[in-house]
């Protein structure tokens, strides 16, 4: 089986992290976002993954060649010369997707969940139509485009953009499975699959919805990245609790790379991910944070709801909070207060940042 992953975007919502690393390679819970998806696809029997790429594709290609060997699969890159939206990339990769008549998966690159690929395939084969989209339940449907479908069969009737009156609380979760016949609908030009292709398929009775069980998050921006981390760690707690760090000083769900070094009298958690080679000195307090590879947090600093970029350094007695994001190789001097700052790569912070802002 095959899968196409849409990784062509610039990752602007996840800046400053994506200024130096393409979004699919940003580590989410100590593994690149893309690998969470690819490994789940391989588990479900996918043997050929096609990446629809544009931005920073050399870095992606290098990383994926190594993974190709490790996972024993084929990975192809389909290069967009211009942005093709969410449907155009399927037309661009048409030849790769249609060399047999098997259905294929399509994924948005920002989605994290308990990927239900086996269930999707079964459901798709049962109804026998051209397309299946996974839907997930949300608390505030008025913020999203919702999917209206028959509860028993899953047949989709229509899509409603940001409804002011309740019609459904199910939204498109960014995971699809299609039969190759569906590709005849798409031309090689910038096209939105959600706005231009799906409504026509639904009208013709060719599109079905499968409801996702378990957690789901679009982790394309920092606050959602952190929320998604909390959900993912809770899922690890339920399915593989031995992967989480326990013991004195660790509270709740904490994932620590074995190469990280943690000093005395630290309090870590709940909901913390600590990457490879990270150093936390004595007396550090961290909650609801992701600390990426090679970062160094000096003694007695206090971090909550932050993402600390690769090889960044946070001084002593610093307080950082409110979705502060440090890009790669940022230095924060001692005894500063950082509130909701977005700090671009390779910057040094010498003064406190009392109000949320971008530091360039």
UniProtKB/Swiss-Prot annotation:
Region annotation (Hexapeptide repeat domain) maps to 245-360
For this UniProt entry, what's an example GO CC term?
A: cytoplasm
Pathways involved: Nucleotide-sugar biosynthesis; GDP-alpha-D-mannose biosynthesis; GDP-alpha-D-mannose from alpha-D-mannose 1-phosphate (GTP route): step 1/1
Chain positions recorded as GDP-alpha-D-mannose binding sites: 110, 218
Name the cofactor(s) required for activity, per the record: Mg(2+)
Q: Which CDD domains match?
A: M1P_guanylylT_B_like_N
Q: What is its EC number?
A: 2.7.7.13
Q: Which UniProt keywords apply?
A: GTP-binding, Magnesium, Metal-binding, Nucleotide-binding, Nucleotidyltransferase, Transferase
Q: How is the cofactor bound, in the record's words?
A: Coordinates binding with substrate and required for enzymatic activity.
Q: Which reaction does it catalyse?
A: alpha-D-mannose 1-phosphate + GTP + H(+) = GDP-alpha-D-mannose + diphosphate
**Residue positions binding Mg(2+):** 110, 218
UniProt function note: Catalytic subunit of the GMPPA-GMPPB mannose-1-phosphate guanylyltransferase complex. Catalyzes the formation of GDP-mannose, an essential precursor of glycan moieties of glycoproteins and glycolipids. Can catalyze the reverse reaction in vitro. Together with GMPPA regulates GDP-alpha-D-mannose levels.
Q: Can you quote the domain comment? A: The N-terminal substrate-binding domain adopts a Rossman-like fold and has a binding pocket for GTP or GDP-alpha-D-mannose. Substrate binding is coordinated by an Mg(2+) ion. The C-terminal domain consists of a series of tandem hexapeptide repeats that adopt a beta-helix conformation. The beta-helix forms several protein interaction surfaces involved in assembly of the GMPPA-GMPPB mannose-1-phosphate guanylyltransferase complex.
Q: Which family does it belong to?
A: Belongs to the transferase hexapeptide repeat family.
Q: What is this protein called?
A: Mannose-1-phosphate guanylyltransferase catalytic subunit beta
Gene source species: Danio rerio
């Amino acid at each position: 089986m095959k899968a196409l992953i849409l990784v062509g975007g610039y990752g602007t919502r996840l800046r400053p992290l994506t200024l130096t690393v393409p979004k699919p390679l940003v580590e989410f819970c100590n593994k690149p976002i893309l690998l969470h998806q690819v490994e789940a696809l391989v588990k479900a029997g996918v043997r050929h993954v096609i990446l629809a790429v544009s931005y920073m594709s050399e870095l992606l290609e290098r990383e994926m060649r190594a993974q190709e060997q490790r996972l024993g699969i084929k990975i192809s890159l389909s290069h967009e010369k211009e942005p093709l939206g969410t449907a155009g990339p399927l037309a661009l990769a048409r030849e790769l997707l249609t060399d047999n008549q098997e259905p294929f998966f399509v994924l948005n690159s920002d989605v994290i969940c308990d990927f239900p690929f086996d269930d999707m395939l079964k459901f798709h084969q049962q109804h026998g139509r051209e397309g299946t989209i996974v839907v997930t339940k949300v608390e505030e449907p008025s913020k999203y485009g919702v999917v209206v479908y028959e509860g028993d069969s899953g047949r989709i009737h229509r899509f409603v953009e940001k409804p002011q009156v309740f019609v459904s609380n199910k939204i498109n979760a960014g995971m699809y499975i299609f039969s190759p016949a569906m590709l005849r609908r798409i031309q090689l030009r910038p096209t939105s699959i959600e706005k231009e292709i799906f409504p026509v398929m639904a009208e013709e009775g060719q599109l079905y919805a499968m409801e996702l069980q378990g957690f789901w998050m679009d982790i394309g921006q920092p606050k959602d990245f952190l929320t998604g981390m909390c959900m993912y760690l809770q899922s690890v707690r339920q399915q593989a609790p031995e992967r989480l760090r326990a013991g004195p000083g660790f509270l709740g769900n904490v994932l620590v790379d074995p190469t990280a070094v943690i000093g005395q009298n630290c309090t870590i958690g709940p909901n913390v991910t600590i990457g490879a080679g990270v150093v936390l000195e004595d007396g550090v307090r961290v909650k609801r944070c992701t600390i990426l590879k090679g970062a160094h947090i000096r003694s007695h600093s206090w971090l909550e709801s932050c993402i600390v970029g690769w090889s960044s350094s946070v001084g002593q007695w610093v307080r950082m909070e409110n979705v502060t994001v440090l890009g790669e190789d940022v230095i924060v001097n001692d005894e500063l207060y950082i509130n909701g700052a977005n700090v671009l790569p390779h910057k040094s912070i010498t003064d406190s940042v009392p109000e949320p802002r971008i530091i360039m």
